[in-house]
A protein has these predicted regions:
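N-terminal metal-binding scaffold of metallo-dependent hydrolase/deaminase domains
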Residues: 1-42, 165-203, 211-221
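Short, well-ordered secondary-structure micro-motifs within conserved domains or adaptor modules
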Residues: 1-2, 46-50, 54, 145-148, ...
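Short loop/helix-cap segments at secondary-structure boundaries that form the rim of catalytic
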Residues: 36-44, 131-136
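Divalent metal-binding segments
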Residues: 66-128, 157-159, 166-172, 185, ...
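Hydrophobic/aromatic ligand-binding patch that stacks against planar heteroaromatic rings
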Residues: 112, 133, 175
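Active-site loop-helix segments enriched in His/Asp/Glu that coordinate
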Residues: 116-155
Length: 221
């Protein structure tokens, strides 16, 4: 068992913030949510991970197809030639793309998503190698009934999207919930301030840790 504690916990679904909150993870599930002191007293033998900032449900990126099937994420070895940012449009059309290359690009794209607190993507993936890369990563799939507004972004909070709209449901305190959550090092967090506004300003690039299915899949160096 592991207790993940943070300065503030946002359970999601309109639940009240928990200062000094924590989640108790047992395998792939969240066993308990609440103030750290209560969880530590109930499970004194549990391992403890201390994170700065805000612990929230993991995020859903609404641009699954756009970021993984309509963009190429360069290999670091290609940085001198192609740069480091995703390539789209004419730059993508100029590349010789094979199924193997699409799969490798998707794996790199998934890693970048995990580094933004993403635990699920929305939108149907039609390319088999891309869908396989996402499935193997453990990312969840959400249905999408209309195209999202604004340009595709690795940050699910970009473009003024309400923070709670980006949270994957159910809330963290839902009984038996899968252990998918993220932690964001939000500057300027205060006891009397609005944590949602602070997180929106910081953006998902402030992610310091992402836990997917109980596994720590991203940790900022």
């Amino acid at each position: 068992m592991t207790i993940h504690r943070a300065d503030l916990l946002l359970p999601g679904a309109g639940r009240a913030p928990v200062p000094g909150g924590a989640v108790l993870v047992d395998g792939r599930s969240i066993e308990a949510v609440g103030p750290y002191e209560e969880l530590a007293a109930a499970r004194p033998a549990a391992r403890v991970r201390r994170w700065p900032g805000v612990l929230t449900p993991g995020l859903c990126n609404p641009y699954g197809p756009e970021l993984l099937e309509q963009a190429y994420h360069p290999d670091p070895r290609e940085a001198d030639e192609l740069g480091t940012e995703p390539l789209t449009g004419a730059a993508l059309a100029a590349l010789e793309m094979t199924e193997s290359r699409w799969g490798a690009s998707a794996r790199r794209g998934v890693r970048r998503m995990l580094a933004h607190g993403t635990v699920a993507v929305a939108g149907r993936l039609r390319r088999e190698t891309v869908a396989d890369a996402v499935a193997r990563s453990g990312l969840g799939f959400d249905e999408r009934f209309e195209d999202p507004q604004g340009p595709p972004a690795l940050d699910p909070l970009a473009g003024g999207r309400p923070v709670e709209d980006a949270f994957v449901l159910p809330p963290l305190d839902f009984e038996g919930r899968q252990a998918d959550f993220a932690v964001f090092d939000v500057p300027g967090l205060s006891a009397d301030g609005d944590p949602y506004a602070a997180l929106a300003r910081a953006g998902a690039a402030s992610c310091v840790a992402t836990v997917l299915d109980g596994r720590l899949v991203h940790r900022r160096a």
